[in-house]
């Protein structure tokens, strides 16, 4: 059954428990609370400053399918870093793709829909993102 919040929680847990991503975000020795401040489940925020790095996990509009009782929810993952560290965002997104593509989330596989390339973000920062989809019964 469709349960977007639980699905988003699982994706956040997968990403926030990966040592390579934590290393890229300079969070390898951070507390769970500090990690949760940098790997968030929403697209809107206004508190990036200095050398902050952040991953945002959120839903985009679902796609319809040929079967009226199923839907294809779309999860977007963005990485925001200081502009001079754009290569870190690209490395993070590469790792996210490896972690999530064909990964089972609540008994449903996630599939990479597309890489989004560079996305708008706050001045002085760089953002890269990608989208994943899965099929769920309504």
Where is each model-derived feature located?
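Short, hydrophobic/π-rich interface segment
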Residues: 84-105
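Generic detector of short, locally flexible boundary/turn motifs and exposed helical patches
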Residues: 38-46, 66, 94-100, 115-117
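Short, charged interaction patches at domain edges and termini
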Residues: 1-17, 60-70, 108-138
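Short connector loops at helix/strand junctions that flank enzyme active sites
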Residues: 50-54, 70-74, 127
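Small/polar-rich, solvent-exposed N-terminal microdomains that initiate assembly or binding
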Residues: 1-62, 87
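Short glycine-rich, basic-tinged beta-strand/loop micro-motifs
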Residues: 68-83
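Residues in well-ordered beta-strands of folded domains
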Residues: 56-58, 78, 133
